[in-house]
Regions:
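Short catalytic/metal-binding and nucleic-acid-binding patches
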Residues: 1-172
C-alpha cells in the first residue's frame, strides 16, 4: 500500500520520513585499540620549501612536542620538498586530529617564518588522513612511503634521503 493511504488513516505520521532522517546519524567509531593514522599535508601551492635541515629540525621539534601539547604520538615521517608524510596515534586524552593538525601547522608556520625569515603561507589548509586498517600494516605503508624520494628521482635509494626519521615507535 502506498504511504499516502497509511498517512490518511492515521497509521503513519506525515512527518515520519523527516523525523527518521533527523535521527539516523552516523555513529562514532569505537576502537578496541587506538588507530594509527597516515597523514599527508602539502605546502601552499606545492612550493618546494621543506627539504632543508632547518625546516626538518623545526618539523621534528614540533612533532616531538605533539605528545605533550596535543596527546598525539608521532611515529615515522618523510619530509619531501613540497609535502610531508607521517604516522600518528592518539592518546586517551588527545585533541581531535583536525585540532592537532591546525595547531601543528600554526606552530611550524610561525617558527619557519621567525627562524628562516620566510614570509607567506606555508601550508595548505587541508590534509589527507587515512586510518590503517587490519589488512595493511604500518611497516608495509612505511616501506611504500619512504620510496617517495626515489620515485620522485631525488635519490637512488630510500636510505639516501636525509629528511626521514621516527619520533616515537608506533609498532605494536
Amino acid at each position: 500500500m502506498p504511504v499516502q493511504i497509511f498517512t490518511s488513516i492515521g497509521i503513519i505520521d506525515p512527518g515520519y520520513n523527516n523525523k527518521m532522517r533527523k535521527r539516523l546519524r552516523r555513529l562514532e567509531r569505537i576502537w578496541v585499540d587506538w588507530p594509527t593514522y597516515f597523514i599527508t599535508t602539502c605546502t601552499f601551492k606545492r612550493r618546494p620549501i621543506l627539504a632543508s635541515n632547518e625546516v626538518a629540525r623545526i618539523l621534528a621539534d614540533e612533532w616531538c612536542d605533539a605528545h605533550n601539547r596535543h596527546g598525539w604520538i608521532i611515529g615515522r615521517y618523510v619530509i619531501m620538498p613540497d609535502h610531508v608524510h607521517f604516522f600518528c596515534r592518539a592518546e586517551l586524552d588527545a585533541k581531535k586530529l583536525s585540532v592537532f593538525m591546525r595547531a601543528w601547522k600554526q606552530w611550524t608556520s610561525k617558527r619557519i617564518a621567525r627562524e628562516l625569515n620566510f614570509s607567506g603561507t606555508v601550508w595548505q589548509e587541508q590534509f589527507f588522513d587515512h586510518v590503517l586498517r587490519s589488512s595493511e600494516s604500518y611497516s608495509q605503508k612505511w616501506d611504500y612511503v619512504r620510496q617517495n624520494p626515489v620515485r620522485a628521482g631525488l635519490v637512488a635509494s630510500a636510505d639516501e634521503w636525509q629528511w626521514q626519521g621516527e619520533v616515537e615507535s608506533l609498532m605494536l
